[in-house]
Amino acid sequence: MDSQEATKNQGDLFPIRTVASETGVNPVTLRAWERRYGLIKPARTAKGHRLYSQQDVDRIKQTVSLLDRGISFSQISKNLETQPPENTETSARSCDTWTAYRAQAIMAIIRFDENQLNLLYNEALSLYPIDVVTEHMLLPLLVSLGERWASSDGSIAEEHFFGAFMRNKLGARLHHRHWTPTGKKLLVSCMPGEHHEIGTMLFSLAAHDHGFRIVYLGADMPLRELVLSAKRAACDAIVISSSIAPHQHILAHELPGLVKSSRYPVIIGGQTSIRCADAIKRAGAHAIGTRIRESIRRMDEILHD
């Protein structure tokens, strides 16, 4: 009896791309979890392709949930088997993992050491889903660099160095992402006047890993062009990212005009979706916050209402 037959009693088996879309964990990371930590043991076809049971999928989702809480890989197997309450010692070890990543990355940025920064970035993304890396490493790094500049410990050059590094990395990932013929299609852009698009790119990659199709327009996009663009691309929703407060005219007139003229849901993410939640609601748009995983979950609810 081969491994595929041995798992028939578990129900349907799913290929790795299906599991990646269901869980938000890309295939490279799934294979790393299997190889390095033995967290999952998928069946194999005669040609060696991985097949995952529903039990495997549930285990992957549990792993993501634990990682999102900051639990380290050394503790995850125990948590999966026993599900004990998270304790202070476990949390401290987990925080140490991300603290170490961030400290090493800061040193690489201070030294303008692109090779070391690249090694850290690739290692983190080989082990963790991009939304977990974003929350625990990349966004805190951006905050730390801003604080260094504000306190005169750092320089604008450091921020520009890291910003250029991230745009190159994320742009390449967006360009080379695996094409999928199904899934809701999102038109993603930044609010007019918004030139910081790293958060928008991170959101787009995480949404893609969760099975959405992405049409990415980038920074400083006039709202008046979004409806026609969404129609031409046959999108299911318009997603706008905004981290700086938009001009009042945009919230009071342009955004309501966009919602009124659009047959697609208009969704706002980023800091503006928190600070200006009431104005966004009055305009008829949906605010989804700043935490990527929760934003994607909320967006999925909006599109399936």
What are these regions (language model features)?
Residues M1-T7:
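Short helix->loop/beta-hairpin flanking segments within DNA-binding domains
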Residues T7-K8, A46, S94, S126-L127, ...:
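Short leucine-rich amphipathic alpha-helices used at interfaces
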Residues K8-N9, L66:
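Short alpha-helical segment immediately N-terminal to, or the first helix within
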Residues N9-T29:
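Polyanion-binding surface elements
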Residues R17, R31, T63, S204, ...:
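Short glycine-/small-residue-rich flexible loop motifs, especially phosphate/cofactor-binding loops
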Residues E22-H178:
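Long amphipathic alpha-helical segments
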Residues D153-D305:
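C-terminal regulatory/effector modules of DNA-binding transcriptional regulators
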